[in-house]
Amino acid sequence: MFEAIIYNISVMVAGIYLFHRLQYSENKRMIFSKEYVTVLMTFVSLLLAAYPIPFQNEYLVHLTFVPLLFLGRYTNMIYTLTAAFIVSLVDVFIFGNSIIYGITLIVIAGIVSAVGPFLKQNDIISLLILNLISIIILLFLALLSPIYELVEILVLIPISFIITIASAITFVDIWHFFSLVNRYENEDKYDYLTGLGNVKEFDRHLNEVSSKAEEKKQSLALLLIDIDGFKDVNDHYSHQSGDAVLKQMSQLLKNYVPNQFKIFRNGGEEFSVVIRDYTLDQSVKLAENIRSGVEKSSFHLPNKEVIKLSVSIGVGYLTQEDRKSQRKVFKDADDMVHVAKSEGRNKVMFNPIVKL
């Protein structure tokens, strides 16, 4: 029995490490993938099904439901039920387990996936709550069906909680470790708070786009976006609230900026968008859409308060005929931001170019 318990815990811990390691090896960035974790936890669940824990040479304790708790917490109902269905089929038709237990596994998957994403507790507590829900379902099964004895559930309770705690701690710790490694390896390119390109990457990208625009005789535009009154958010609420605003702002910008253009956080409360081969009207319209979108949006703070914000946007623009000067387009955009601020904020300002 002891060997089987160690095996089950080892399979879970090794599987969790493998998930993080494979994902990091593939893209060098820690981006949570529902597909990755579903494939992994399905495989781990099958390994646990192949090696149940014997007790008194009479009972077998199955822990195949534990990996499904992670799917219920971190993915959604479709992924969790798909994994449960696959595991149930293999468990019944290959490992010879009862079809009633297979159905119970699917019921557990459905319930934990409906509850898991909405739990407000931290990850470890949330997984323990899902484990408790699963135990209650299995207890109900033991009372109604002769195929599962009450003594098996009593043995299952401490073992399942131990493996859930060990797996949850491993999952969270390894995630934090690889996230720190990812942050260290990408700090020259990415802003760790928002995930956008940082000011170094902005300079490199603007230089690259300027060269391409010059070579292909295309226009070049730059939007500098500054959050109005951001210092007041930090001072009145907290720096944690300011960080929350920056994260939400970066997501809002992603919703408005076309995929072919890159967004950067230049530092503090300033963001930028580099645009190539757009007319001045198109560039100004994009800036106005962003300004209007921010004005209509609500920003949620960690203390549950909701605030409204605005942005001032400066547009720098070089026509197809202009020499593509990285310094000039930045200066024009920066000057226009200051004009927008002086004109009362919450404005888009640009310097119209008229050639006679």
Swiss-Prot record:
Keyword DNA-binding among record annotations: no
Keyword Ribonucleoprotein set for record: no
Listed SUPFAM superfamilies: Nucleotide cyclase
Gene Ontology cellular component terms for the protein in this record: plasma membrane
Domain GGDEF: start-end pairs: 218-353
Gene Ontology BP term (one): cell adhesion involved in single-species biofilm formation
UniProt keyword annotations, A-Z: Cell membrane, Membrane, Transmembrane, Transmembrane helix
A molecular function GO annotation: phosphorelay sensor kinase activity
Pfam families per UniProt: 5TM-5TMR_LYT, GGDEF
Subcellular location as annotated: Cell membrane
Bilayer topology term: Multi-pass membrane protein
Transmembrane segments: 2-22, 35-55, 76-96, 99-119, 124-144, 151-171
Entry-linked PANTHER family: DIGUANYLATE CYCLASE DGCM-RELATED, REGULATORY COMPONENTS OF SENSORY TRANSDUCTION SYSTEM
Name by which UniProt lists this protein: Uncharacterized membrane protein SERP0413
Source organism per UniProt: Staphylococcus epidermidis (strain ATCC 35984 / DSM 28319 / BCRC 17069 / CCUG 31568 / BM 3577 / RP62A)
